[in-house]
Amino acid sequence: MKPIQARIYLASRSPRRRELLRQIGVQFELLAFRGGERGKDADVDETPHPGEPVERYVERLALTKAEAGCRRLQWRSLPHHAVLGADTTLELEGQIIGKPVDASDAAAILHQLSGRTHRVLTAVALSDGSRTRSRTSISEVRFRPLDDDEIRHYVATGEPMDKAGAYGIQGRAALFIEEIRGSYTGIMGLPLFETAQLLESFGYPL
């Protein structure tokens, strides 16, 4: 697929989001924030608000990242292009589950997911400074029951550490998944259907 000529900025450090944008031929430049890990980003407060629904939470973070990216362009006098922001969050019985803070936390999260169905929500937002739009993908993922050894060995690979829910569907954790309903790319971290809708609404040809 020939890359589109217009560029965007991707306000994310995620290698999976970069891979998915390349998959559909989008030209982009990275626009990194300070910090970069959940809870450590000086530009984006990722603390859930009291009583905030998970759908609103994930949308708020994606919008905030895109809008913060536009401000960063102004501060740094960078060429003006639209900024794409995204956030992925898991929900299990009303509990928001983000990235693990350490190996013990990763193991605890995987024990929670074992043998159960959870939701994966990925919101994507696009902003050019004067207009901002967003879309959200919601999928369901069911894990088979996992034993302690499986969880310990998986955590030891290091794969869970930079991922919401402590697993990557495109990696070794694919062996844990009995069923998915929804968007595979949304579960990876960037729903391509919704992303294409946003790009086209801003006049980016695909």
Curated annotation (Swiss-Prot):
Its main location: cytoplasm. Gene3D superfamilies: 3.90.950.10. GO terms for cellular component: cytoplasm. Keywords: Cytoplasm, Hydrolase, Nucleotide metabolism. GO terms for biological process: nucleotide metabolic process. It is found in: Cytoplasm. Its EC number is 3.6.1.9. Nucleoside triphosphate pyrophosphatase that hydrolyzes dTTP and UTP. May have a dual role in cell division arrest and in preventing the incorporation of modified nucleotides into cellular nucleic acids. Belongs to the Maf family. YhdE subfamily. This is dTTP/UTP pyrophosphatase. The lineage of its organism: Bacteria, Pseudomonadati, Pseudomonadota, Betaproteobacteria, Rhodocyclales.
